[in-house]
Amino acid sequence: MIRKRIASGTMMLCAAMMLVACSNQTESQNVSWKIDSNLQHIVNEPEILTSSNPGDYIAANTEAYAQILDTGEEGLNFLIQQLDSSSNDGLKEWLMAQASTELLGERNLVEHWQSGKDWLRQYKMKVE
C-alpha cells in the first residue's frame, strides 16, 4: 500500500515537472515568435521602405514596436542573443539594439552607437 502511494506520488511529481518544463518552453517560443514577427512587420513596412532613418520605421509601426517591448526581460535576452548571432548589421539589427536599450532602461551603459553591432560590442565591453 505504501509502495503504491510512493509510486503514485512520484508519477504525479514527474508529470507536474514535465508540464512546467513544457509551459516554460512554450512561453520562450511565444516571445521569440512575437519579436520575430513584429520585427519583420516593421522592416517590411511598404510606406517607408525608402527611408534611411531607422526611427521612421519605429514611428510608422508603434504598435508592433510596443509589442516587442512588452516581452520584457525574456525579450531582452532573446534580442541580445539574436543580435549576437546575426551576420548582418542592417535595419533589423539596429531595431533590435534600440529595443534592447529601451528594455534595459537605466541599466543601458552605452550612450552613443551607430549600428546594432556597434551597440552590442560596446554593451558587451561594459558589462563584462
Question: What kind of region is each of these model predictions?
Answer:
Residues 18-21:
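C-terminal motif of bacterial Sec signal peptides marking the signal peptidase cleavage site
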